[in-house]
Amino acid sequence: IKHELLYRGAYFCNEEQKQALRNTMFPEGRLNAAIVGQPAYKIAQMAGFEVPEDAKVLIGEVSDYSMDEPFAHEKLSPVLAMYRACDFDDAVNIAFTLVDAGGAGHTSVLYTDERKRERIEKFAKTLHTGRI
């Protein structure tokens, strides 16, 4: 999936860039309104690093999905967290934890083989979001 995201214009941040983004996105623990709705390259500039102007989204690979991790919060901007899961059940658990902490008004999306009905049903029953 990482290869496909890169192909589609994602920019994967290194450790230093992730920390700069954390500090820029949530100074003093609150969402920085200046990043809302801005393109990825402008947010990167605000954080003190450069990305190509055609970068569509900034992605931080993180493992902490608690609310202590700024990437786990809603950012209202083209900045995403990417989590690695052991298996499908672990991925659903991570998603549930994020939605539970962030609020049910959000959207959840599952990309899977349409023949995997048990996965689709588990995802739909577990994640209580406004839009599935």
Residue spans of the language-model regions?
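ALDH superfamily catalytic-core signature
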Residues: I1-S66, A91-N93
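Conserved C-terminal structural/oligomerization subdomain of aldehyde/semialdehyde dehydrogenase
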Residues: F49-I132
